[in-house]
UniProtKB/Swiss-Prot annotation:
GO terms for cellular component: chromatin; cytoplasm; nuclear membrane; nuclear pore; nuclear pore central transport channel; nuclear pore cytoplasmic filaments; nucleoplasm; nucleus. Part of the nuclear pore complex (NPC). Required for MAD import as part of the Nup107-160 complex and required for nuclear export of Moe probably via its association with Rae1. Plays a role in nuclear mRNA export. Promotes cell antiviral response by up-regulating FoxK-dependent antiviral gene transcription. In germline stem cells, involved in their maintenance and division together with the TGF-Beta and EGFR signaling pathways. In larval lymph glands, has a role in the maintenance of hematopoiesis by regulating Pvr expression. This is Nuclear pore complex protein Nup98-Nup96. It comes from Drosophila melanogaster (Fruit fly). Contains FG repeats. FG repeats are interaction sites for karyopherins (importins, exportins) and form probably an affinity gradient, guiding the transport proteins unidirectionally with their cargo through the NPC. FG repeat regions are highly flexible and lack ordered secondary structure. The overall conservation of FG repeats regarding exact sequence, spacing, and repeat unit length is limited.
Length: 1960
């Protein structure tokens, strides 16, 4: 396996790759050559692999000599685990050195043969020789050793023994009968509970069977389940009593939580048999007081049933060997030792640290013996830093980092190094003073690669400190998790004998212990020490991993500690991994991840209670399903009770339920599971069940983000220039509400906002320190500590002094100046956001403050308010009268810029006015408006996710004035709130998944606003409003909406409709109500109405109380009441209908009352006017909900009208009415949502006045009234309709919402059908202008237009005619046609065209474009483009025979581009412009910008400026001149002399120096400023780049100029004015793209050919398509086929719209894909060919056939299609036959032509069509149904023709011959005529005509051929021919006459000749 021969379990092999395991010191991976030291055994024992050891066992037990044999690790007499073996070779060949009798664990065995682990007579684990496999065989009954050497009983055993065996004395790994695995005997296997009897044999499961059920008289097979344990096959032979008795005998009398076997049987309850004489784990003598790792024996039982875990042996280790005071692993497991984990040992008897194999005498983890040598993994000069780098003069380290002593036979893993030399590789307890590093995972700390990771020396610790076992040195640290306590203790894994300092950093202070938490002893054991590990926090002993006595993974100290997996730790309830009672371990809920707890709460809200275990959450939709048992029972009950007769005299009870608004029922834990569990372990988040009260400490200076009291503004401007608004103060940081602001000064109680927020998340406010902080803050801010409110949790909320909220009497409070409590919910203060001018109103607003707050005054806050008010009053008013002093608010244009808009008359008309607030949003007014005199502080208010303009409705101007107009609102930071983390959700992907934008859209629809967009990056919500009130996202909008599942949504919709119907009021109650004067209403006490005292009517709810208040009372009560008109809808009281109120009032459930309630829906509309009714004279004053003007409804049915004006007294019910006033008022409020005026029919309402006595109730029992419905002759305009007043509630009624809307849809030929009015149509007819304006076509109904509605059909010319289009494009298309190649594609009739390669197209297009110069802007631009193409790619005389990439070619192209730039930039009047002395410098600069250097020098000479002319003459001369000029400019700059030089002159000097930018005394000078992109590129080419640079160099320099972060050049925008700026990618000029394409061949052709790069008409593709073909000819073919095809199709459509469809086909032939090309050409042909019976081909059709090669059959088929669409079926058949589409032609002929031809007798025409099917070979065969359709017609025509020929023949013989030839054909046709399909009546007529003709032919044949029996022939003809009834009757009569004649002419029967016998 490792390189040697592969003997099978014992054969002697040759040398292996391990090298030195046969007695000689050969080179092996673990020998000297591999690791630098002599060959040694692998695990440090000479008996292990090759050398002669001193008879030492694996764990240090002395072995006696015996016969030589070879085991797995070199033991000759033992098996792999201790049984004696013979001296045969081992399985690995090289392990054959004869050894002594000592086994791997030190016990002496007799000799035997070698098996898998070194013996043959004994099995693999020391048992008797098996008869089967090694795992589970039946052993012979000889007393041989078990798995670990102990003698086995003569019983059978399984492979691992102890997984359910029945023999109590089984020999196995963990549970033999001789001795247990850990030095104690046990009766059963590990994990077994004895013999499985009783109910433990098998797990209980219901028994599934079948049965027969009789249903409806038929037997049906059904599945059954028997819920009884005796029905199971395992228990079918026993009764319940027998099973119970067996369970009792086994000790099972209840739930066996502690007795169930674990994964490996840990925790199984076993019995205690007699202890045998021997029993260590591996064969050593068992001691009565040994534990696994050396702890003191106590009476507590181990989880293995004996004392294996938890008992401390006196002298023996776990494996039966005598303990010695050696180093680690040279002592028993658990024995106390004087050496720490990694300290050096006294001798080298341990197999992991002995001299042989890998080093002389070292322990496993680095103890060193006396000598020193290079370690196995620690030799010098290794390549990797962490694997043994050179240690210099220091000692070399081991595998785990320990420095070895002078040992020649060093262990491979450094086992045996001195513990004081270095820290180990994993930090196992080395001191912190070692200088030697290295080893497998760590090298020298100062120089190595992996110094601090594994094994480096550290004064603190290694990264994995607490798994490292530190020495007892006081200052040393190190360990797996960086624990560095200096108190010596046991190791982190406990029990390996070493001391440890606070393992795992999870506890501190518990002395002694182990990983698994056993009680501390002087030397802790692996599973039982005193040190708490992995999470223990207490000092008392708690549970170990397996239920020991100390705190472990999950222990929290004291007596509450649990086992590692949540198991109990009490000795009486000794727990195991899987079997103890859970307390507070790792798996307890308190230590489970929060997300798992949340999911458990959501999925199982009732927990694990057995009462609710079967109660599952189900949706309401499931209740109605047929599979629901409850629904089935309901159906059964319904059907069973349907025909029962009740004997009771009482009417059937009816339960009436009031209809109200349904509450939003939500689970308490909904939304908490949104948190991602995958990152749960890496986030520190609060508990989901803990109340976290976040402090919002704000000083007076800090203020509230929504108020301006905190700090006075510095300036009246909205935003000072250069100053950045306070982001922290005015914007949100993701938390809602926003975090506390830092105070301006060191005021008492000020805290940092971010710090307080974090503390609120991580600390409990119930902590004493936090409580003390809050109390101190409240004391410092003036709060009364002895207040009764401060004795509860209320004291946890830091509060401001209450005088902060009490305004000064001199300050006028508004919405912007009234401070709000930062600790209140902001939604509760919305009702107080009104502007009040009176002090009384101000007091009423603040009346809800507590008495304590009013008693405590804060002078500091009052002084701050007064100072702010005084400072604001002292500020200089703005000239425009605009008031804006609040911090954070701004305007665009700014207040300073608005001064320039001020007119002489005082107005300030500003376009695009914007008002905003930093961090909250802005409002944009797009139209011009007068902003003079606006007090923006009182008008505009931005809040969190909302905007309020004109909060006071009374001061709001009409729509269109002031700021109450159409505007665009942007609200920033509108993000939803994460319920789990209490933070805003900003992830765009998560916002998309939760459809946040859709929710905002629905809010916009709800508020009658138009949604524009949502930007998730900034949370900006943009929408447009028509007028202003309050807009935003309220608290109710933030709540989760109804489920989006289609089924649930349907149910939710039905519920919403039911609620809406319940909330709608009927007008009947108002029509029956009396009208009471307003004066009497003032005398009515609202409190009396509410209390119902001395009035005789039911008390009202809060709604009616508010309705009866006047304005002042309403706002005074608004602060103390829960009801407010400005509160969210969810805070308002439930609105119920009058019927629901009646239902609430009814006592009992009598059916009579239900009938009364039903009859209330049919109350008479009009009460008799002659019935006087009494009234009390009292009036009810209603609060105005809406300003409704008087409305008039008129129709043809009635002339009556009804006026509703809520400003006047509304109809009210009598006081004695049983309908409550609350319902009436709510009805009046919700009247606008009723469906009184649905559709176009509105019932007439008659205005009546009638009085009702106080004691008289409603007249409920009335007969329904039937009113005829008549169409109205007039239509009420929407502004005058009552529906207009309900526009805010239209969303609740689709009849209103869509009642006045109409969907526009375009029809054929760009026609549009839309509604209009009769008057508008008259105006259109009377219009006499040249072109009809679109506004008149779409004119709405005016306010005075009552004319009926009409429908109008309008046709539009969708594409505006392009003048000169034909003249500009046809020459270029002809050029393209002449230079293209037509290729015939195999398998296709359609050719493919592509341009010819070369530069000819460039030259020809350029020449053609020059002819069109000055024809228009597009033509001029086209000339510029083609000239640029000619300069970059065209053929020039000087470029003939030059290499493309030669320098001369590059310079020539540069000169050509320079020439093109000069011609393009040169203005028409630049050279002829007149200049003066003052302007010549500027003119010179213009000349230089066009590269007119000579003209500029001449101009300088003319003005005696010779020096400047000399400088300009050297432009572009080279680098030396530019350097000199640059130095000169720098000198002028340093001496400040440049301020005396003209700016234009300096710019020219900068051109000479080649510097585009310079800092001077004039400021920053940018030569490219305000220059278009062509000029900037030209300056780069001419002056800034080297004269020898290429076009690419100049282009790159320009790219750097405009693409840099601080760009100083204009980007290459298109030349047309309205260049798009809102595209995702910037749009650049076409010429710039061509330059890029010349410089970079793979530049995107898709971007280059986009029409918007050169024209504002995105549908103009002519130049783009021509460029595509030209570039393809030049070799640029990397454009995608899809883009090419799309561009060709678009350009062809443009040509088609211009009437050039033939050229459109030419364009379509350039499509590469064959199928797309053919389909596009055929479709265009079908749309544009002309159909004429006279003209075969028109000129365009001849062009496409002759010039373009379109097949004629395509043209014919296109004409056939167009003829068919036009109804010209004869032409259609003609063209189909020419196109050889015979099947289609046959169908057309049969459907439309043949019946008419037969009926009308046009046989020749029909024959000319049908004969073409016969003439063409095989055509009739390819036509389906030819035999029963076309063939019948053709045969009938042939027979008719032959009959006519017979009639012209005079020869009798010839006639008879012809008739004989006609007989078969006639007979066959008579048989097939009935098969002719007759889809229409015309076809049936045609069939009858043919049948009649055939009948006549039959008669003629009978006449001509008298020998034929006419009667027989006629009979046959009548049977076969489908004749009409009349004709058949006529023929039958004729046949009967002939038959009678025949009978009469025959002789009598007696005279007939009798037949002879021969004849018979």
């Amino acid at each position: 396996m490792f390189g040697g021969a592969k003997p099978s379990f014992g054969a002697t092999p040759a040398a292996t790759s391990f090298g030195g395991f046969s007695g000689t010191t050969t080179t092996t991976p673990f020998g000297q050559s591999a690791f630098g030291k002599p060959a040694a055994p692998a695990f440090g024992n000479t008996s292990t692999f090759a050398a002669q050891p001193a008879q030492q066992s694996l764990f240090g037990a002395a072995a006696t000599p015996a016969q030589p044999a070879g085991g797995l690790f070199g033991a000759n007499t033992s098996t792999g685990f201790g049984s004696t073996a013979t001296a045969q070779p081992t399985a690995f060949g090289a392990f054959s050195q004869p050894q002594q009798t000592s086994n791997i664990f030190g016990s002496t065995q007799t000799a035997a043969s070698t098996s898998l682990f070194g013996q043959s007579t004994l099995p693999a684990f020391g048992a008797a020789k098996p008869t089967m496999t090694a795992f589970g065989q039946t052993a012979a009954a000889q007393p041989t050793g078990s798995l670990f050497g102990q003698p086995a009983a003569a019983t059978s055993t399984t492979g691992f023994g102890g997984f359910g065996t029945s023999a109590p004395t089984t020999t196995n790994v963990f549970g033999s009968g001789t001795a247990s695995a850990f030095a104690q005997p046990q009766a059963t296997a590990v994990g077994a509970s004895g013999v499985n009897t009783g109910t433990a044999v098998a797990k209980y499961q219901p028994t599934i069977g079948t049965d027969t059920l009789m249903k409806s008289g038929q037997a049906n097979s059904v599945n059954t389940k028997q819920h009884c344990i005796t029905a199971m096959k395992e228990f079918e032979g026993k009764s319940l009593e027998e099973l119970r008795l067996e369970d009792y005998m086994c000790g099972r009398k209840g739930p066996q939580a502690g007795n169930a076997p674990g994964a490996f049987g840990f925790g199984a309850q076993v019995t205690q048999p007699a202890q045998p004489a021997s029993g260590g784990l591996f064969g050593s003598t068992a001691q009565p007081s040994t534990g696994l790792f050396g702890q003191t024996v106590t009476e507590n039982k181990s989880m293995f049933g004996t004392t294996a875990f938890g008992q401390q042996p006196a002298t023996n280790n776990a494996f039966g060997a005598a303990t010695q005071q050696n180093n680690f692993l040279q002592k028993p497991f658990g024995a106390t030792t004087t050496t720490p984990f990694a300290a050096p040992a006294a001798d080298a008897s341990n197999p992991f640290g002995a001299k042989p194999a890998f080093g002389q005498g070292g322990s496993l983890f680095g103890q060193a013996p006396a000598t020193s040598a290079a370690p196995a993994f620690g030799q010098t000069n290794t390549g990797f830093g962490g694997f043994g780098t050179t240690a210099g003069a220091t000692q070399q380290s081991t595998l785990f980092g320990a420095t070895p002593a002078a040992d020649p036979n060093k262990s491979a893993f450094g086992l045996g190094t001195a513990a004081s030399a270095a820290t180990t590789g994993f930090g196992f307890g080395a001191p912190a003073t070692s200088t030697a590093g290295g080893g497998l995972f760590g090298n020298k700390p100062a120089t190595s690669f992996a110094a601090p990771t594994f094994g480096a020396t550290s004064t603190a610790s290694t990264p994995f400190s607490n798994f490292g076992l530190n020495t007892s040195t006081a200052a040393t640290g190190g360990g797996l998790f960086n624990s560095g306590l200096n108190k010596p203790a046991t190791s982190g894994f406990g029990g390996f004998g070493a001391t440890s300092a606070a393992p795992l950093n999870f506890n501190a202070g518990n002395t002694g212990g182990s990983l698994f938490g056993n009680t501390a002893k002087p030397g802790g054991g692996l599973f039982g020490g005193g040190t708490t590990t992995l999470g223990g926090t207490g000092a008392a002993p708690t549970g170990g991993l397996f239920g020991g006595g100390t705190t472990s993974f999950g222990g929290v100290g004291g007596s509450l500690g649990g086992g590692g997996f949540g198991m109990g730790t009490n000795n009486s309830l000794t727990g195991g991994i899987m079997g103890a009672q859970p307390t507070l371990g790792i798996m307890t809920p308190s230590h489970q991840p929060i997300h798992q707890q949340i999911l458990a709460r959501v999925t199982s809200p009732y927990g694990d209670s057995p009462i609710f275990k079967d109660l599952k959450l189900s949706s309401e939709a499931d209740a109605t399903r047929a599979t629901n048992p409850a629904a089935q029972q309901a159906v059964l009950d319904l059907t069973s009770n349907q025909y029962k007769i009740s004997t009771s005299n009482n009417p059937a009870p009816m339960k009436v339920k009031a209809l109200g608004s349904t509450l939003n029922r939500k689970s308490l834990f909904d939304g908490l599971e949104e948190f991602d569990a995958s990152v749960e372990g890496f986030n520190l988040k609060p508990s989901a069940k803990r109340l976290v009260i976040k402090p919002k400490v704000k000083s007076v200076e800090g203020g509230n983000p929504s108020s301006s009291i905190g700090s006075a503004p510095n300036t009246p401007q909205s935003r000072p220039k250069g100053a950045t608004p306070n982001k922290e103060r005015e914007s949100f940081s993701g938390a809602i509400p926003s975090e506390p602001l830092p105070p301006a000064g060191n005021s008492p109680g000020a805290t940092n906002g971010r710090e307080s927020q974090d503390n609120g998340r991580r600390e409990s406010w119930l902590h004493p320190n936090n409580l003390e902080k809050v109390r101190q803050h409240n004391i410092q801010t003036g709060m009364d500590q002895g207040s009764p409110h401060n004795s509860t949790l209320n004291e946890l909320v830091p509060r401001k002094p209450l005088d902060t909220y009490r305004p000064s009497s001199t300050v006028r409070l508004s919405v912007s100046t009234i401070p709000e409590n930062p600790f209140e919910d902001q939604s509760s203060t919305i009702a107080r956001r009104e502007t009040f001018t009176s002090q009384q109103a101000n007091e009423s607003v603040l009346s809800n403050r507590s008495n304590e707050a009013e008693d405590s005054a804060a002078n500091q806050s009052r002084l701050a308010i007064e100072a702010a008010a005084a400072e604001a009053a002292d500020d200089e008013s703005h000239p425009t009268g605009i008031v804006l002093r609040r911090v954070g608010y701004y305007t665009i244009p700014s207040l300073d810029d608005l001064r320039s808009y001020l007119a002489e008359d005082g107005s300030c008309v500003v376009p695009n006015f914007t008002v905003g607030r930093e961090g909250y949003g802005n409002v944009f007014f797009g139209k011009e408006m007068d902003v003079a005199g606006l007090n923006l502080d009182e008008i505009v208010h931005f809040r969190n996710k909302e905007i309020i303009i004109y909060p006071d409705d009374e001061n709001k101007p009409p729509i269109g004035q002031g700021l109450n107009r159409d505007a665009q609102v942007t609200l920033d930071q509108v993000w939803p709130l994460d319920k789990t983390k209490h933070e805003a959700i900003k992830d765009p992907q998560r916002l998309l998944e939760m459809d946040w934008e859709g929710k905002l859209r629905r809010v916009c629809d709800k508020n009658d606003t138009r949604f524009i967009e949502y930007r998730p990056e900034t949370g900006s919500w943009v929408f447009r409003v028509k007028h202003f009130s309050k807009y935003g996202l309220g608290d109710s909008d933030e709540e989760d909406e109804l489920p989006t599942d289609p089924k649930k949504a349907k149910i939710a919709t039905l519920e919403a409709q039911q609620r809406a119907n319940a909330e709608k009021m009927t007008l009947n109650s108002l029509r029956q109500a009396q009208k009471i004067s307003e004066d009497a209403a003032r005398n009515l006490d609202p409190k009396a109405l509410v209390a119902g005292v001395a009035s005789g009517f039911r008390p009202m709810d809060d709604t009616a109380e508010f309705l009866l208040m006047d304005k002042t009372q309403f706002f005074q009560a608004g602060g103390n009441s829960d009801f407010s008109m400005f509160d969210p809808p969810r805070q308002r009281p439930t609105i119920t209908s009058p019927t629901a109120v009646l239902a609430q009032e009814m006592v009992g459930n009598e059916a009579h009352k239900m009938q009364l309630m039903k009859s209330s829906f049919f109350v008479e509309d009009n009460a008799p006017e002659d019935e006087p009714m009494e009234t009390t004279g009292r009036l009810l004053r209603h609060r105005k909900f809406f300003n409704v003007e008087p409305l008039v409804w008129k129709d043809g049915a009635s002339e009556s009208s009804s006026q509703y004006d809520f400003e006047h007294p509304s109809p009210a019910l009598p006081i004695s009415s049983s309908v409550s006033e609350a319902s009436l008022m709510c009805d009046a409020h919700y009247e606008e949502t009723s469906s009184m005026a649905t559709g176009s029919i509105v019932a007439a309402v008659k205005e009546t006045k009638f009085e009702m006595p106080v004691t008289k109730a409603f007249k409920f029992v009335c007969k329904p009234k039937v009113a005829p419905i008549k169409l109205r002759a007039t239509t009420v305009p929407l502004p005058r309709s009552i529906a207009y007043e309900m526009r805010d509630n239209w969303i609740a009624d689709l009849g209103f919402y869509k009642g006045r809307s109409f969907k526009l849809s375009f029809g054929p030929q760009n026609s549009l059908v839309l509604p209009s009015t009769y008057n508008n149509m008259q105006n259109l007819k009377e219009f006499t202008g040249p072109s009809l304006p679109v506004s008149m076509v779409f004119a709405p109904r005016s306010a005075t237009d009552l004319s009926p509605s009409v429908m109008q059909l309008v046709e539009f010319n969708m594409v505006k005619g392009n003048e000169g289009f034909r003249e500009s494009i046809i020459p270029h298309l002809e050029v393209q046609l002449n230079d293209c190649l037509s290729v015939n594609v195999e398998g296709s009739e359609c050719p493919c065209i592509h341009p010819d390669s070369g530069t000819k197209l460039v030259s020809k297009h350029f020449s053609e474009s020059l002819k069109q110069r000055n024809a228009g802007l597009k033509e001029d631009y086209s000339v510029s483009v083609w000239s640029l193409l000619f300069a970059l790619w065209g053929d020039h005389d000087e470029l003939v025979d030059l290499e493309k990439n030669s320098h001369y070619m590059v310079m020539c192209r540069r000169n050509l581009l320079s020439e093109w730039l000069e011609n393009t930039l040169l203005g028409k009047d630049l050279l002829s412009k007149k200049v003066s002395t003052h302007s010549y410098l500027e003119h010179m600069l213009d000349l230089l910008s066009c590269h007119r250097v000579n003209e500029a020098c001449e101009l300088a000479f003319s003005y005696d400026d010779a020096n400047l002319a000399l400088v300009l003459s050297q432009l572009s001369s080279g680098a030396v001149f530019r350097l000199l000029m640059e130095e000169q400019l720098f000198a002028w700059q340093q001496s400040k002399s440049d301020k005396y030089i003209d700016l234009e002159r300096l710019k020219m000097y900068m051109l000479a120096a080649g510097a585009p930018m310079m800092q001077s005394s004039h400021g920053a000078i940018n030569l490219l400023e305000n220059k278009n992109w062509l000029t900037a590129l030209a300056l780069q080419l001419w002056y800034f780049t080297a004269p020898t640079s290429s076009i690419t160099d100049a282009l790159n320099a320009y790219n750097d100029a405009f693409q840099a972060e601080e760009c100083y050049a204009e980007p290459p925008k298109p030349s047309y004015r309205d260049a798009p700026t809102d595209t995702k990618k910037p749009v650049y000029d076409l010429r710039y793209h061509l330059l890029q394409l010349h410089s970079k061949r793979m530049h995107s052709l898709e971007e280059t050919l986009n029409p918007i790069t050169h024209t504002a008409d995105a549908m103009d593709f002519r130049l783009s398509w021509l460029l595509l073909q030209t570039l393809r000819a030049l070799g640029y073919r990397h454009c995608s086929p899809l883009t090419e095809a799309r561009l060709s199709v678009d350009f062809a459509s443009q040509l088609e719209n211009e009437g050039l469809w033939q050229w459109g086909i030419f364009v379509l032939l350039h499509i590469k894909q064959q199928t797309q090309r053919e389909r596009a050409v055929q479709q265009m042909l079908q749309r544009n060919v002309s159909v004429s019976a006279k003209v075969a081909l028109y000129a365009e059709e001849r062009f496409i056939v002759e010039e373009l090669g379109i097949p004629m059959s395509w043209v014919d088929y296109a004409k056939a299609v167009k003829a068919g669409a036009s109804g010209k079926h004869h032409l259609q058949a003609k063209y189909l036959l020419k196109a050889k589409h015979f099947a289609t032609a046959h169908d057309v002929i049969f459907q439309h032509i043949a019946p008419d031809a037969i009926i009308n007798g046009k046989m020749k025409y029909l024959h000319s069509l049908l004969i073409q099917f016969e003439d063409t070979e095989g055509s009739s065969i390819r036509v389906p149904n030819w035999a029963n359709q076309g063939q019948i017609f053709l045969d009938f025509i042939d027979i008719s023709a032959k009959f006519k020929q017979i009639r012209s023949v005079t020869n009798i013989a010839d006639i008879n011959a012809r008739w004989e030839n006609l007989k078969p054909q006639l007979s066959e046709l008579c048989s097939r005529i009935s098969l002719l399909p007759c889809p229409t009546s015309k076809h049936r007529l045609c069939q009858s005509e043919i049948s009649q003709s055939l009948s006549c032919l039959v008669h003629g044949m009978c006449i001509v051929c008298p020998e034929m029996e006419s009667s027989t022939v006629l009979k046959v003809a009548l049977e076969r021919l489908p004749l009409p009834q009349e004709f058949a009757s006529k023929e039958l009569r004729i046949w009967l006459e002939e038959l009678l004649d025949k009978i009469q002419n025959e002789p009598p029967f007696s005279e007939r000749q009798q037949p002879t016998m021969m004849e018979i």
